[in-house]
Structures are given as C-alpha cells and as structure tokens.
C-alpha cells in the first residue's frame, strides 16, 4: 500500500528509502549551528557561546539544553504537521536528529538515567487524540536505550499559552504538574523530551518539579526552539 510518507512532507515530491523529506527540503531545514545555542536551555542564539535573555537574567532548573533546529520556515512546518495534525511517522526523523545531537554534542557523556516527556491532562489528550511528546520519547528511548518514566502527570488544565510572556505562562502553570513517585528520580540525570521551546516556561516547571525530587541534573532536548524575543513583563 502506498504510504503518505513516501512523499516529501514539505514539497510533496516522491521520495525513496522511506525518507520523510527530499534532499533539497532537508538541506533547507534551519538546523541549529554548532555552538549557536544557549548553554542552559538550548534556544538558538545569534552569537556562539552566549546565553539567551531568559537564562541570562533568571535562575533556571535546566542544566543543559539542545534543539535540533530553529522554529521557523520548514522547521516550524514539520513540527506543526507532527504536533497538530498527528503525523506520527515524523517522530522517527525527529528522534534520529535528536540522537545525533545526543552523541555528537556529548549529552551521552552525562550518563542520563531516565527520559520524561511533558504530560497532558487526560481531558486534553482525549481531545487531541495523542500526546506527541510521548511519541517522541518512545522513539528516542529506543535509540538511546534509556528508560522512560511516566511519573510526571499534569493535574490542572491551563489556559491557552499562545501570546503570553514567560511570566504569565509560569503563573498559568503553577501547580499544574505532579510527581506520582519521587524515589525513582533521586540522584538521577533526567532528559526532558519536548517538541518546541518557546518561552521555556513549561520545561522550566517540569524541571523544577524534578529538582524538588532530588534530580541531580536536568537536560532538555527539543525538536525546535524559538529565537527568544523579549515581551513586556518578561524578566
């Protein structure tokens, strides 16, 4: 049976060998340049080796962060197809690109113990029909052989975050996450796998919850990140 992913997901040309993108579109993806990311959250930066405005001006529970590409152009298109249109098969491409970073940028050297993903409330997951973060975590776990923890749950519905600054998002997320078990996290190095870093508020709240359980180090790995632009009210 002819499968949908045998056509490039950007330009719809026919592709071969079960590829999701043609060579031309893959080369056009805005991959994060070596070193051009915030050392803490992995957000793309213009100057190599600098911190983003958020991490420069705030204490953060995230110790190390990396993103595959910038959330723009064909990068944002692919994430949108995956996140909002359920193109599940893209998880393999995303996980493979994250795995390259895991090996080449030395994330493996931190000897991570567990992978977690950003949970959704049961109601939100039923409405969407899937959790794209879980899909990604499962695929990344296969490649790294790091087990997934399902102990983080979201217990509070939160208002739509689009258009809100970091401070407003953090306020919305207060009390939204709960750990079913703290023992499994104590002294561990944990990777948070997520789709997009925008203000970083969601990952920060998850990281804080992990640190409260005694996690030694939190690593954030995302498909894409938004080059941060300060909004009124941000710190």
PLM region spans:
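Glycine-rich phosphate/pyrophosphate-handling loop used in enzymes and phosphotransfer proteins
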Residues: 1-193, 198-235
């Amino acid at each position: 049976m002819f499968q949908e992913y045998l056509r490039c997901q950007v330009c719809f040309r026919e592709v071969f060998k079960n590829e999701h993108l043609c060579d031309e579109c893959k080369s056009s993806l805005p991959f994060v340049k070596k070193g051009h990311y915030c050392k803490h959250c992995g957000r793309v930066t213009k100057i190599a080796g600098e911190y983003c405005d958020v991490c420069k001006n705030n204490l953060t529970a995230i110790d190390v962060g990396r993103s595959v590409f910038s959330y723009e152009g064909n990068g944002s298109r692919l994430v949108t197809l995956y996140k909002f249109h359920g193109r599940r098969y893209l998880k393999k491409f995303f996980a493979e690109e994250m795995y390259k970073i895991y090996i080449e940028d030395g994330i493996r050297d931190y000897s991570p113990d567990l992978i977690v993903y950003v949970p959704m409330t049961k109601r939100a997951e039923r409405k969407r029909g899937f959790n794209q973060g879980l899909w990604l975590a499962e695929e990344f776990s296969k490649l790294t052989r790091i087990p997934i923890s399902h102990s983080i749950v979201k217990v509070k519905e939160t208002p739509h975050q689009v258009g809100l600054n970091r401070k407003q998002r953090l306020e919305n997320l207060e009390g939204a996450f709960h750990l079913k078990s703290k023992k499994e996290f104590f002294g561990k190095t944990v990777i948070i796998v997520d789709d997009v870093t925008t203000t970083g508020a969601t990952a920060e709240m998850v990281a804080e919850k992990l640190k409260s359980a005694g996690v030694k180090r939190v690593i954030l790995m995302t498909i894409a990140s938004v080059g941060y632009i300060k909004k009124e009210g941000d710190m």
